[in-house]
Amino acid sequence: FSRVAGKAEWNNKAESGSVTLDGPAFYYSLEASKEELGILAGALANAEGQRLALLPSGEAFVEILDDVQLESNGIQRRVRHYEITGLGFLPVSVWLDESGSFFGFVDSWLSVIPEGWEGAVETLLEVQQTRSVAREQQWATELADLPANGFAITGVRLFDADSAVTRDGMTVLVVGDTIQAVGTDGSINLQD
């Protein structure tokens, strides 16, 4: 990656391109390390509106969340939780220390954290999980737009557990949070 006189160029094993920039932007490489997330979080935290254009395309936003006090072998460190939106379908968590440097990335299947601080992974995961549950509950409330009269799903392939068969061409009528009727397509009155 290079940026010279307002022109950014990139080239890696999967992509190459260039663009003329008229403002701040961050190149987030396809092969980004977890430490690069920390650099991005810091750049976003210092950007106007905590947003930056991403190269080769897109935009990222950061939300600065919880501070957590950690201790390992008598040493204490305060770390801060950052959530970056715009890299995928869900926000990505990263932890920075008090100086704004990368401290860690923790996940249930992969964690990158300084040697000696491995014991903090569970604490940080718990904070992230609490945030994730709260976010999903908020989304469920904000995004749930159930029609007052219900809705029908037609052309359903339904598994009938009583007879252990699948049935094609079925309609499922949902009113509120309850399945009101199930029948073959065209057999349920959808007008009421």
Where are these regions (language model features)?
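Gly/Pro-enriched, hydrophobic low-complexity segments
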Residues: 80-112, 186
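Aromatic-rich beta-strand edge motifs centered on tyrosine
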Residues: 1-3, 93-98, 113-119, 172-174
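Extracellular/periplasmic ectodomains of large secreted or surface enzymes and adhesion receptors
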Residues: 114-155, 188
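Solvent-exposed helix/loop surface patches that form functional interfaces
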Residues: 1-78, 103-106, 126-130
